[in-house]
């Protein structure tokens, strides 16, 4: 570690540098874990939110996940085309659509979550349960300071 610290110089003590490196490792392993499903992290996130809040509208999903409104339509269309989410005209506002997860969507979410749990177990194998809880707490504190997060 000391040799690596010297090689990266002034980056070594920067938390953002290490967050970016950790994210890169997580993202690459996540992509490998999802191989063959046709799913990406953003799609799994949307599917999970809609599953937990049946009837939610796409604007609310976007706000919860920090996805720009302009990107939500194509992402929802992708999930609808995959037959994982159904878009239904909202009875209270005919201009709006509510979202629900289909049976295929529930099965896909179950499959993805099992793969994600295995991916996280592998990635965090060197951490105790207490360290994982601390990591989640610390990351949550950083997220709550992010004005773009909501």
Q: What role is predicted for each listed range?
A:
Residues 27, 55, 77-140, 144:
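Charged, amphipathic alpha-helical coiled-coil/dimerization segments
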Residues 57, 68:
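Helix-turn-helix DNA-binding motif, specifically the short coil turn and the N-cap/start of the second
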Residues 1-37:
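N-terminal leader segment of winged-helix/HTH proteins
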Residues 62:
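The alpha-helix within a helix-turn-helix
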Residues 42, 70:
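Key DNA-contact positions within bacterial/archaeal DNA-binding proteins
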Residues 18, 25, 29, 45-48, ...:
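Pre-recognition alpha-helix immediately N-terminal to the DNA-recognition helix
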């Amino acid at each position: 570690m000391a040799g690596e610290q010297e090689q990266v110089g002034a980056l070594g003590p920067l938390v953002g540098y290490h967050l970016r490196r950790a994210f890169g490792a997580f993202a690459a392993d996540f992509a490998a874990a999802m191989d063959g499903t046709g799913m990406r992290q953003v799609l799994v996130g949307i599917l999970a939110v809609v599953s937990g809040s049946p009837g939610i509208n796409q604007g609310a999903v976007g706000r919860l996940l920090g996805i720009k409104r302009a990107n939500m339509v194509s992402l929802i269309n992708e999930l609808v085309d995959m037959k994982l989410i159904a878009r239904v005209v909202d009875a209270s506002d005919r201009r709006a659509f509510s979202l629900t997860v289909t049976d295929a969507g529930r099965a896909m979410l179950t499959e993805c979550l099992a793969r994600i749990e295995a991916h996280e177990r592998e990635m965090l194998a060197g951490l105790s349960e207490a360290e994982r809880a601390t990591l989640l707490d610390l990351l949550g504190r950083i997220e709550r300071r992010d004005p773009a997060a909501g």
